[in-house]
UniProtKB/Swiss-Prot annotation:
Domain S5 DRBM stretches: 12-75
Keywords associated with the record: Ribonucleoprotein, Ribosomal protein, RNA-binding, rRNA-binding
Protein name: Small ribosomal subunit protein uS5
A single cellular component GO annotation: small ribosomal subunit
Length: 167
């Protein structure tokens, strides 16, 4: 289950998706440590995720936030929704997202919702298939968002005008 915490730092929105206790078994017993999964975005088309591991929870969260800030990618949004329906996949997780009309809101669950919120998407319909492991869902969602192309990019590739592309 993805537990989401929001924090604003500077111009970036930060969300904590999950914290897990993990253990390493050694000769003398178990050594416990914590992992944290976070997403960071500016609410305007930039999003990144980070995964941190440390002996203490705050240190794991701090590491994850720093990694997320270093891994920001740009997403080409159409106002406050997506350009077109998209699919993303990572490992056993598959995600499907499609643009929605104004006032729909973010219809997404758990980890996918956190990514879409910090990316600045406000109206979207989405569904996660297969594995709902938060790490894989976050990676699949970001993969899908980065694969999205705007009509301008499609027109440039095809050598046509945007009006010809849109019909």
């Amino acid at each position: 289950m993805a537990k989401v915490e929001v924090q604003q730092q500077g111009d970036l929105l930060e969300k904590l998706i999950a914290v897990n206790r993990v253990s390493k078994v050694v000769k003398g017993g178990r050594i416990f440590s914590f992992t944290a999964l976070t997403v960071v975005g500016d609410g305007n088309g930039r999003v990144g995720f980070g995964y941190g591991k440390a002996r203490e929870v705050p240190a794991a969260i701090q590491k994850a936030m720093e990694k997320a800030r270093r891994n920001l990618v740009d997403v080409d949004l159409n106002g406050n929704t997506l350009q077109h329906p998209i699919k993303g996949r990572h490992s056993g997780s598959k995600v499907y997202m499609q643009p929605a009309s104004e006032g729909t809101g973010i219809i997404a669950g758990g980890a996918m919702r956190a990514v879409l919120e910090v990316a600045g998407v406000q109206n979207v319909l989405s569904k996660c298939y297969g594995s709902t492991n938060p790490i894989n869902v976050v990676r699949a969602t970001i993969n899908a968002l980065t694969e999205m192309t705007s009509p301008d990019q499609v027109a440039a590739k095809r050598g046509l005008s945007v009006t010809q592309i849109l019909g």
